């Protein structure tokens, strides 16, 4: 009798633990963040293709798309472009681009976007006309409110000197943010010295014209928009009960996948205080942006790694980044076929590398683990909705 009682207690404990695990997974808030980096967007594009392929296999659904699994998808610069590609609906209300169409998009359009240089000292390096044309052709008249999941795309208004964050959740309060996706994409990619700033207008809540004068989102949020994406997810908690689990920044209830576009710890050349002591504006201008982007991305990753680990949820955060780019792969505007092929190889090789010195798990294994969590969570929510 005692043995039977002990056995029943054990079963109850197992069921309770299992139930708690699944409940926790069901409540997870999922966030995807994609860095800026111009043509280097090929690297996260390669990673996204792998991830979406895994989700399709796990769910036995060739039509499965990343927007079906993430509550918030955020990006800046080329990351904003990728965000739009995988969240903007087509005529069937599905993402107009599958993940395996991202890299071919760069190969087809990259050489034309980064072409027709107009001279870097007396104007932007590129006129941006082809970029705007291809965005209009692919994104059409779609606006922010039509995105298939919550988005977080950053830009910076040089007239008001304030960052502008385009999200669905802000539209009720600020309808002027319901801009056309092609205007948003061009704006977040309009890196100073590379492309001209972008001017366009929308309507305010009173029907008045509201004007934007925007440049690259990296000016507002640095190249890594992970913190921005988290803040948008957190704000959703104030309005949607489904996000209640992160109202107090409970990172145990959040899955964050952050994709970088690659950096190098050496910047191709190192410098000493002595040799830079007499540098002027031009010398610093040639290297400071790369240094700043790399340093800020490192600090964002350091902060997120620390807070997730502090809540014993380090497995919930995955930063996929190549830190050893060399040669032309470090350039954001080298759209030669040879360099683009090299960037694809960087992405594919990255999948085989360990996540860190302390974590022998490869990025491929980590992404498969993430895919399993995303798949299971989607099924749990679908089952709950059917009752």
From Swiss-Prot:
Which tissues show it? Tuber.
Instruction: List the ranges annotated as motif DGA/G.
Output: 216-218
Keyword annotations for this protein, in alphabetical order, are: Coiled coil, Glycoprotein, Hydrolase, Lipid degradation, Lipid metabolism, Plant defense, Signal, Storage protein, Vacuole
Extract the GO molecular function terms from the UniProt entry: monoacylglycerol lipase activity; nutrient reservoir activity; phospholipase activity
Record family assignment: Belongs to the patatin family.
This protein's source sits in the domain of life called Eukaryota
Instruction: Tell me the protein's name.
Output: Patatin-08
Q: Name one GO cellular component term.
A: vacuole
Q: GO biological process annotations for this chain's record?
A: defense response; lipid catabolic process
Domain characteristics, as noted in the entry: The nitrogen atoms of the two glycine residues in the GGXR motif define the oxyanion hole, and stabilize the oxyanion that forms during the nucleophilic attack by the catalytic serine during substrate cleavage.
> What positions does the record give for the motif labelled GXSXG?
75-79
Mention any additional remark: Patatin have a dual role as a somatic storage protein and as an enzyme involved in host resistance.
Subcellular location field: Vacuole
EC annotation from Swiss-Prot or TrEMBL: 3.1.1.-
Q: Where is this motif: GXGXXG?
A: 36-41
Function of the protein: Probable lipolytic acyl hydrolase (LAH), an activity which is thought to be involved in the response of tubers to pathogens.
- Lineage in the entry? Eukaryota, Viridiplantae, Streptophyta, Embryophyta, Tracheophyta
């Amino acid at each position: 009798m005692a043995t039977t009682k002990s056995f029943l207690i054990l079963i109850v404990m197992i069921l309770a633990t299992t139930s708690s695990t699944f409940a926790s997974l069901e409540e997870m808030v999922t966030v995807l963040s994609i860095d800026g980096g111009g043509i280097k967007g090929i690297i996260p594009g390669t990673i996204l293709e792998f991830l979406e392929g895994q989700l399709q296999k796990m769910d036995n659904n060739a039509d499965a798309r990343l927007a079906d699994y993430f509550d918030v998808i955020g990006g800046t610069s080329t990351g904003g472009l990728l965000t739009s590609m995988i969240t903007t609906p087509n005529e069937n209300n599905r993402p107009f681009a599958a993940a395996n169409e991202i890299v071919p998009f760069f190969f087809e359009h990259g050489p034309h976007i980064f072409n027709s240089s107009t001279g870097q000292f007396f104007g932007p390096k590129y006129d941006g006309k082809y970029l705007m044309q291809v965005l209009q052709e692919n994104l059409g008249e779609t606006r922010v409110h039509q995105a298939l999941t919550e988005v977080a795309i950053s830009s910076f208004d040089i007239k008001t000197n304030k960052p502008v964050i385009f999200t669905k959740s802000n539209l009720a309060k600020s309808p002027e943010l319901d801009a056309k996706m092609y205007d948003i994409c061009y704006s977040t990619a309009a890196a100073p010295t590379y492309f001209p700033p972008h001017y366009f207008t929308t309507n305010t809540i009173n029907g008045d014209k509201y004007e934007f004068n925007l440049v690259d989102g990296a000016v507002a949020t640095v190249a890594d928009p992970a913190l921005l994406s988290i803040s948008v997810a957190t704000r959703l908690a104030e309005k949607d009960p489904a996000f209640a689990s992160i109202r107090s920044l409970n990172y145990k209830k959040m899955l964050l996948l952050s994709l970088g576009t690659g950096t190098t710890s050496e910047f191709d050349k190192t410098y000493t205080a002595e040799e830079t002591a007499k540098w002027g504006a031009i010398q610093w201008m040639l290297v400071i942006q790369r240094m700043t982007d790399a340093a800020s991305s490192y600090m964002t990753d350091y902060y997120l790694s620390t807070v997730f680990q502090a809540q014993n949820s380090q497995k919930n955060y995955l930063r996929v980044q190549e830190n050893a780019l060399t040669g032309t792969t470090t350039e954001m505007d080298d759209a030669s076929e040879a360099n683009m092929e090299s960037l694809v190889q960087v992405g594919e090789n990255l999948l085989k590398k360990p996540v860190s010195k302390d974590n022998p798990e490869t990025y491929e294994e980590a992404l498969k683990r993430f895919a399993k969590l995303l798949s299971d969570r989607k099924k749990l929510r679908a089952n709950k909705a059917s009752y």
